[in-house]
Regions:
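Central "turn" residue of the DNA-binding helix-turn-helix
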Residues: 48-49, 60, 96-98
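Short alpha-helical "recognition helix" segments of helix-turn-helix
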Residues: 43-45, 91-92
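Short, basic, alpha-helical segments at the C-terminal edge of helix-turn-helix-like DNA-binding modules
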Residues: 70-80, 117-123
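Short, Lys/Arg-enriched, Trp-marked, Pro/Gly-tolerant hinge/linker segments that flank
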Residues: 6-25, 43, 61-68, 72
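Basic, amphipathic alpha-helical hairpins
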Residues: 11, 27-39, 79-87
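DNA major-groove recognition helix of helix-turn-helix
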Residues: 59, 66, 70, 106-107, ...
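Sequence-specific DNA-binding recognition helix
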Residues: 84-121
């Protein structure tokens, strides 16, 4: 079985009593690449060694679009950086946003709270 096929298998597998579904495997495989400048559906499919169409079908089966997947991955990384103490402006740049306000709006749209509420403040 190819690596991509293993990542995208439809059934859930048990691993030490914890269930992982296909979307968890996709997230894990793509997370290191999501901040690449040209990270698109084609690149994601290449990373996990499947066709673009196969990746689209698998995501659809899981009830998620590629854009939602990418946004969720970026949000996860942004949350981690904010919780580690990075400034909102630094995280905005790290995530590839052209402005702090653009990042703040996108973050609030996805989470319901502004990134400044997540950021760790120095004592």
């Amino acid at each position: 079985m190819a690596k991509g096929e293993m990542i995208l298998r439809e059934e859930e597998e048990e691993n030490n009593g914890i269930y992982y579904n296909a979307i968890s495997h996709i997230y894990s495989a793509l997370r290191p690449y999501v901040l690449e400048i040209k990270f698109d559906l084609q690149r994601a499919a290449q990373v996990i060694n499947v066709s673009k169409r196969t990746l689209q079908r698998r995501l659809k089966e899981q009830g998620i679009t590629f854009r939602q997947l990418r946004d969720n991955l970026i949000l996860d990384i942004a949350m981690e950086q904010l919780q580690r103490g990075e400034t909102v402006s630094r995280v905005a740049v790290n995530m590839g946003f052209s402005s702090i306000s653009q990042f703040s709006r996108a973050f609030k749209r996805m989470t319901g709270i502004p990134p400044s509420r997540i950021a760790v403040r120095p004592l």
